[in-house]
């Protein structure tokens, strides 16, 4: 992913650091030393909350509003939340119930939720050769990916055994 970001943004401000999968430090190392997480859409915010660290969600990520993040709706609310948390970090650590909610949500997200999808970001062109659009929209493709596509366009999702 770091390669994708560097290709899209060849000039990055000096205060922004991209951590590649091959770097000696990783996001989990950063979580260990963090007092606060600021998340937009990645799972890092959820994983930070799993460690009892408060997380302010800036975007509309899937775990927003699940009871273990701070969810401002405006920029003014964001800066108020940021000031409140930074003024008393220990008081804003997640309690046991909030941390358990983060763990429960993460388990369901990583192990129960994954749905079949024909293309992945990292191997998109290879996947596209195996699953060209016409094949995905064929009877075979719809039988394999139809429920996923219905969910992605907002139809109610039915869990199957």
Residue ranges and their predicted role:
Residues 1-23:
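Catalytic donor nucleotide-activated moiety binding site of glycosyltransferases and closely related
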Residues 23-70:
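A donor-sugar binding/catalytic signature common to diverse glycosyltransferases
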Residues 3, 46, 76-80:
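Feature representing long, continuous alpha-helical segments
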Residues 76-161:
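C-terminal amphipathic helix plus adjacent low-complexity
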Residues 10, 39-42, 49, 83-90:
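Hydrophobic alpha-helix feature that most strongly marks membrane-spanning transmembrane helices
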Residues 17-20, 69-84:
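Short acidic-hydrophobic, aromatic-tinged amphipathic segments that line or gate anion-handling sites
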Residues 12, 28-31, 92:
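A short, structure-level motif marking secondary-structure boundaries and short turns
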